[in-house]
Amino acid sequence: MGDRLIAWGVPASKVRELAWWEETEEDGIRFVPGPAKHFSGRTLRDGNSTQWASWIIVDGATRVFFSGDTGYSAGFRQIGERYGPFDLTLMETGAYDARWPGVHMQPEESLQAHLDLGGKWMLPIH
């Protein structure tokens, strides 16, 4: 993904490629990519060539979780155990379809993921 961002004009000095659970910090704010259940690809030839992720954002005592596109998984409980509880969770919902059970969540799954994370406030997104 880093090469693609650089090709789009993002300065290489601003690009950081991370694996799940690998932390980075910017201006005192910690960013951690966490597990997600999805796939990647922009063209017919690059399927699953980059890692998908959720995001854990920590600023002092404030904790925010951003799910990104994801299906429900045990990863939410793992994230909650490692980084929770969260003040705010931004949870993917609304792109659900019977054909996409593994990569998007039904509303009740989004709520369960929020609870697994130990979330206080939930903002449904897509």
Tell what function each PLM region has.
Residues 8, 20-21, 52-55, 100, ...:
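A residue-identity detector for tryptophan
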Residues 1-2, 19-23, 94-95:
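Short, acidic/turn-prone active-site loops that include or flank metal/cofactor-
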Residues 2-3, 38:
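A short acidic, glycine/proline-enriched capping/turn motif at secondary-structure boundaries
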Residues 12-14, 28, 87:
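Short acidic capping loops at alpha-helix termini that bridge into adjacent secondary structure
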